[in-house]
Design a protein with these regions (language model features):
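Intrinsically disordered, low-complexity terminal regulatory regions
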Residues: 1-88, 92-175
Length: 175
């Protein structure tokens, strides 16, 4: 699925990503501007924190976005990638960054479905939500990137992602 601009929670099937989108929307409401990183409190996202990563938008001398840097990687991201890439750079324009590029360009949340082929031979499909943040309220300088693995009924892995997902879903269901 190609990256899609998200305007309403109903456009997102996954309960974890819906909760993160609703939180971002709440922080953006009534401001007439994008929320800043300073507006985001990890305590508010405790139930879904394993799904959340923060990505810094690096700009060139002309102010154009060119590279992304993982500031913090959530447990889902670490499990999907098979390593913690905190601090690593990613060139904007690489296939994985389509949703990020669109969120930066539009200043709007973007949803995309991704398929990842880890070295162990399994196939993992997951939803990705990119929510833009801007210190000045306009120019995107950070992204909340949230991922939620999709599992088929009889294809649940026994790894950490599954434990994170179950715990987060149980917490969300209690609310």
């Amino acid at each position: 699925m190609s990256p899609t601009i998200i305007d309403h929670e109903a456009q997102i099937a996954d309960v974890l990503l819906r909760q993160i989108f609703a939180y971002w929307q709440e922080k953006a409401a009534g401001r007439g501007a994008l929320p800043a990183r300073a507006d985001i409190d990890p305590v508010d996202l405790a139930a879904v924190l394993p799904a959340v990563s923060l990505i810094e938008v690096r700009r060139d001398v002309m102010g154009r976005p060119g590279r992304l840097r993982y500031r913090v990687m959530g447990g889902f991201h670490v499990e999907i990638m098979g390593r913690d890439a905190t601090g690593e750079l990613l060139d904007l324009g690489a296939g994985e960054s389509d949703a990020a590029a669109q969120a930066i360009a539009t200043g709007r949340p973007i949803y995309a479905e991704r398929t990842f082929y880890p070295a162990n031979g399994t196939v993992l499909t997951f939803g990705t939500l990119m929510c833009p943040l801007a210190t000045d309220g306009r120019k995107v300088d950070m992204l909340i990137c949230a991922v939620a693995p999709h599992y088929k009924a009889n294809d649940l892995p026994v790894g950490r992602v599954n434990r994170f997902a179950r715990a987060a879903l149980e917490t969300v269901a209690r609310r």
